[in-house]
């Protein structure tokens, strides 16, 4: 197995590219990220590690703009993400200068996925150890979009999805609870999904909301705490209702 294990461009006899599978494992060990598409907004939420006491929290952002109308969150290796984000931003700017129009969300998703795929079959490089969630608004139709890419270069569109640590649990939660929502309800669904795996509440969650009119806005910690408190109150009320004795008719 060792021969196929080391060579990035060589398939194993049973059809595996082990370096790509190892990159997918790096994603599975990364912090959880979730994206939810609403009718008038799109929300990205990520699990963030506790920062050191003297660290500037503003320097640790996991949700970033690629363009005024497109944002990205990722799970996996942060250094790999920095390289991919910079390449994507340059492509967005180049497209504006060349075509004199902003990129569509699908266009930049295809570009990022193509770059990830290229690094699975080129010598002297290794696959990107990250999966991305890309959200934005189409500059022509104004409709919100959510896409995911993975280290193999595969991409697909979603109504809601998760990647990173315990992504299967989050995805199951979204499948059970997703419905077309708007405004604050979309934000609440994304945070509820993250709370399935984040045990420390709102302090270890980063959330950003994108709307067509206002672009991307990072939620303040106090806003996240207020929504988490609202979710906890709803859970407590639901539990109390279950335990309450049935009323006589």
Swiss-Prot record:
Annotated SMART domains: Proteasome_A_N
Compartments (UniProt record): Cytoplasm; Nucleus
CDD domains attached to this UniProt entry: proteasome_alpha_type_7
Gene3D superfamilies: Glutamine Phosphoribosylpyrophosphate, subunit 1, domain 1 (3.60.20.10)
InterPro entries linked to this entry: Ntn_hydrolases_N, Proteasome_alpha, Proteasome_alpha-type, Proteasome_asu_N, Proteasome_sua/b
Gene Ontology biological-process entries: ubiquitin-dependent protein catabolic process
Keywords: Cytoplasm, Nucleus, Proteasome
Superkingdom of origin organism: Eukaryota
Gene Ontology CC: cytoplasm; nucleus; proteasome core complex, alpha-subunit complex
Function: The proteasome is a multicatalytic proteinase complex which is characterized by its ability to cleave peptides with Arg, Phe, Tyr, Leu, and Glu adjacent to the leaving group at neutral or slightly basic pH. The proteasome has an ATP-dependent proteolytic activity.
Assembly with partners or alone: The 26S proteasome consists of a 20S proteasome core and two 19S regulatory subunits. The 20S proteasome core is composed of 28 subunits that are arranged in four stacked rings, resulting in a barrel-shaped structure. The two end rings are each formed by seven alpha subunits, and the two central rings are each formed by seven beta subunits. The catalytic chamber with the active sites is on the inside of the barrel.
Name assigned to this protein: Proteasome subunit alpha type-7
Gene: PAD1
């Amino acid at each position: 197995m060792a021969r196929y294990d080391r060579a990035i461009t060589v398939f194993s006899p049973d059809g595996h590219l082990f370096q790509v599978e190892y990159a997918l494992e790096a994603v599975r060990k990364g912090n959880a990220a979730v994206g939810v598409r609403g009718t008038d907004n799109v929300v990205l939420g990520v699990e963030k590690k506790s920062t050191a006491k003297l660290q500037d929290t503003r320097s640790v952002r996991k949700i970033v703009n690629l363009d005024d109308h497109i944002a990205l969150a990722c799970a996996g290796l942060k250094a790999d993400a920095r390289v991919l984000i910079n390449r994507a931003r340059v492509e967005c700017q180049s497209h504006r200068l060349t075509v004199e129009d902003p990129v569509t969300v699908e266009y930049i998703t295809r570009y990022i996925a193509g770059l990830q795929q290229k690094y699975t079959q080129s010598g002297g490089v290794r696959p990107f150890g990250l999966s991305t969630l890309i959200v934005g608004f189409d500059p022509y139709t104004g409709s919100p979009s959510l896409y995911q890419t993975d280290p193999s270069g595969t991409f697909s569109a979603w109504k809601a999805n998760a990647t990173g640590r315990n992504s299967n649990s989050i995805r199951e939660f979204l499948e059970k609870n997703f419905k077309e929502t708007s405004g604050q309800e979309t934000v609440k669904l994304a945070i509820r999904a993250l709370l399935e795996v984040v045990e420390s509440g709102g302090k270890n969650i980063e959330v950003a909301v994108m709307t067509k009119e206002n672009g991307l806005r990072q939620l303040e910690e106090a806003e996240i705490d207020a929504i988490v408190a609202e979710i906890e109150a709803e859970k407590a009320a639901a539990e109390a209702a279950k335990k309450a004795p049935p009323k006589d008719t």
